[in-house]
Amino acid sequence: MTQGPGGRAPPAPPAPPEPEAPTTFCALLPRMPQWKFAAPGGFLGRGPAAARAAGASGGADPQPEPAGPGGVPALAAAVLGACEPRCAAPCPLPALSRCRGAGSRGSRGGRGAAGSGDAAAAAEWIRKGSFIHKPAHGWLHPDARVLGPGVSYVVRYMGCIEVLRSMRSLDFNTRTQVTREAINRLHEAVPGVRGSWKKKAPNKALASVLGKSNLRFAGMSISIHISTDGLSLSVPATRQVIANHHMPSISFASGGDTDMTDYVAYVAKDPINQRACHILECCEGLAQSIISTVGQAFELRFKQYLHSPPKVALPPERLAGPEESAWGDEEDSLEHNYYNSIPGKEPPLGGLVDSRLALTQPCALTALDQGPSPSLRDACSLPWDVGSTGTAPPGDGYVQADARGPPDHEEHLYVNTQGLDAPEPEDSPKKDLFDMRPFEDALKLHECSVAAGVTAAPLPLEDQWPSPPTRRAPVAPTEEQLRQEPWYHGRMSRRAAERMLRADGDFLVRDSVTNPGQYVLTGMHAGQPKHLLLVDPEGVVRTKDVLFESISHLIDHHLQNGQPIVAAESELHLRGVVSREP
């Protein structure tokens, strides 16, 4: 032994730390002796992998390693779920992922490289794991059959009873009582019942939960088809579907218990019976098989949900800013926030389209919203209903001779239609491009004048030759005429027009990008851009109360007189001209 300069032996090097033994997550829990379990046999057992391993080793269960000072009873380990004593893979379920993920790492030194096996372990659980208490012998059918064609059973349909309250608002015991009370009510109502059932007094507490009964198809032998899509009840001979319940519409299922060994009851919603409890009578031992198959279908459907959960709907990325409109550009949408529009207000009758050759309004609106396409043209090419009258309701699939045709302009809603909406006198001729009455009246007048030998002074020309009704105002000016005005900017989008406004009273006139020939007045009022249509569907330039000869006449009138344009309880002053760029 070598001594140092001071005669003392050098200190021995520290011993390396002992590696920590693998510890399950169960051993990290403190003892909880106050926990008492009345029926530990009903807990979830170990996974199928451990069961097969135990069977291969002679049927004896492997003994878990003795827990350290912080051990936990074996019953508490069973509560943690269907894991082996030493968990092999994390479970993708949210409630069990943390505990099983911690136990699967084995030691602290291996936690860094454990993330690579998470995906494979999760996929393995989705394929073999279970969160429903399986029968001792496992599921009755292969997963591929329940996922694919499904499983069918022949049972006897007992009818259904309306359930007035949502099953989510009831606890588990109340749900079970609801199904038993439904069986109790239908047991004597259906003749020829063969299943064993002990008649009980009606449960008055459930009077507000159960409603009327539907005994149609009651007592018939039917087929119940079970798959991950749902449950379907049908008559085997005629293949008539009694009920078809998708898996999300099924809220509760019960059956095969000690007091209802021959019956299966489940609560589901459908368009005919709404929320109802359907009762099935089964032969001996079949009720447990049906409930087990339903549980297998539920488990596989939930695993599909875990494997591909629905996408979360994200909010729109952009919101309406100070310089952009609330509905985007005109190229993006046909709905505009014109301030002289009122919901439900229709444009005046008339236009340059023959209403007898047009379709009804719903078809026209669809064509405007989605644009012309071969499918829409085929859908709208309906035969004429010669015998139909104007009293038929609109949109009944037939063309009405007096229906209003689709306008050849943007579908805007006007408020300044008092004059055009006023009823015309009964003797006023109706506007019709193909109306031949004015010419017939003129010929009759000429023939009468010749036959009577009229020698008096000739009548004015307009009285001798009646003409069809004319417009109330001139047609809107052409593009060449508007190009001479400094406030006209030609074809421009709403956003570009709004960006050119600086102060209240600034205005310009533009041509619509979506529908050329539709002229829009864009101005600034109270810091907000406003849009006003200047030409109505009949081609008349006007405001709410005044008709004008042209757009230039309208602008000059309000600009020189300082009068605001009033519409829809708002007003727009024209003070500053926004000149177009040269």
Curated annotation (Swiss-Prot):
SMART domains according to UniProt: PTB, SH2
Tissue: Expressed in brain. Expressed at high level in the hypothalamus and at low level in the caudate nucleus.
Domain PID: 147-329
CDD domains reported in the protein's UniProt record: PTB_Shc, SH2_SHC
Compositionally biased spans, kind Pro residues: 8-20
Modified residues (Phosphotyrosine): 338-339, 414
Record's comment on post-translational modification: Phosphorylated on tyrosines by the Trk receptors.
CH1: annotated span: 330-486
InterPro entries, sorted: CEP152/SHC-Transforming, PH-like_dom_sf, PID_Shc-like, PTB/PI_dom, SH2, SH2_dom_sf, SHC_SH2
Single annotated GO MF: receptor tyrosine kinase binding
UniProt GO BP: cell surface receptor protein tyrosine kinase signaling pathway; intracellular signal transduction
Domain notes from UniProt: The PID domain mediates binding to the TrkA receptor.
Protein name per the record: SHC-transforming protein 2
